[in-house]
Amino acid sequence: MYKRQLLHRAFAPHDPALRVSAFGVHFPGPLGLAAGFDKDAACAEGIAALGFGHVEVGTITAHGQPGNPRPRLFRLVRERAVINRMGFNNEGAHAAARRLRKPRSVPVVVGVNIGKTKVVPESEATADYVASARLLAPLADYLVVNVSSPNTPGLRNLQAVSLLRPLLTAVKQVADATPRRTPLLVKIAPDLADEDVDAVAELALELGLDGIIATNTTIRHGGETGGLSGRPLKERSLEVLRRLRAKTGDRLTLVSAGGVEDVDDVWERILAGATLVQGYTGWIYGGPLWAARIHRQLLRRVHRHGLKSVTEAVGRTA
């Protein structure tokens, strides 16, 4: 515990100019860790101590599951990318809830990303998500409905508005009923057609969601089966962000993920309308203190542009 506190003091963002407020939650810095690393909510404090402004745990399913057979994770070093077909391997919502109830030794904003249990048929998906939400929404700083992983059969079908509306409506009822109303976001794929991106944005506004995370991994590649993350995703992720900003303005919190490697990427996403930015593959290649380094550089960028806060830069080029 003491070591975590020392690390947090040394590397976590502390400058007021980096603070961000989104959907009623206060973040010490805009750059967080995307879901996929801390699948069981086991080490969020340690991750935050390395310089992240928030940690999104999961993806967590209602029932524990082993995920797909190994090998299921592949580095593409030359492309600064990763292909994964993990398949939501996790111990389940009950195990995650036990960990999330424990007191934290350092302050950390924890988002909880939930997905569909693999063996649950599509017709029962809503009930499956609701089961996770009931356990985890009261323990989360924000909740994310993941309908965009390519590694659970049929999951991406749930991005169709006709299926997504009842799913999000049901989960939102659970999130809204928590003592402090847990903010709810949806995470979408980069492979959606532009008109489908627009449709999800309109649905999010209609239902009163708090935000959209864009984007998950892509299946548009020629390598191993699975979702591709990292540098090759950069261009499309930025396109989707700009489209969402044009569609929603500042009515939704936009969280940009996909191809984020350095401070220039983070700054570009903020200028394009992202209030928060997430990375994972960039951290793999950038080393343990990747987020701390970017936050330091981002602070210098804010000062160089004569801004009092990073929030003043959100959407400046949108």
Residue ranges and their predicted role:
Residues K3-P16, P150-L163, V197-D250:
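Glycine/Thr-rich beta-alpha phosphate-binding loop at enzyme active sites
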Residues G58-V108:
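A gly/proline- and charged-residue-enriched helix-loop-helix capping module
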Residues G24-G32, V106-V112, D176-L192, L244-S256:
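Short beta-strand/loop segments at the ligand-binding rim of alpha/beta enzyme cores
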Residues G51-Q65, V147-S149, G211-H221, V266-R293:
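Glycine-rich phosphate-binding active-site loops on the catalytic face of alpha/beta enzymes
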Residues G64-R80, H221-G230, I284-K308:
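C-terminal helical cap(s) of enzyme catalytic domains, especially alpha/beta-barrels
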Residues D40-A49, L192-E206, A246-D250, V260-V277:
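Catalytic cores of alpha/beta
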Residues K3-V20, N84-N89, A93-H94:
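An N-cap/entry alpha-helix motif that binds or orients negatively charged groups
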Residues T117-V130, N157, L163, V186-L205:
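Active-site glycine- and acidic-residue-rich loops that bind
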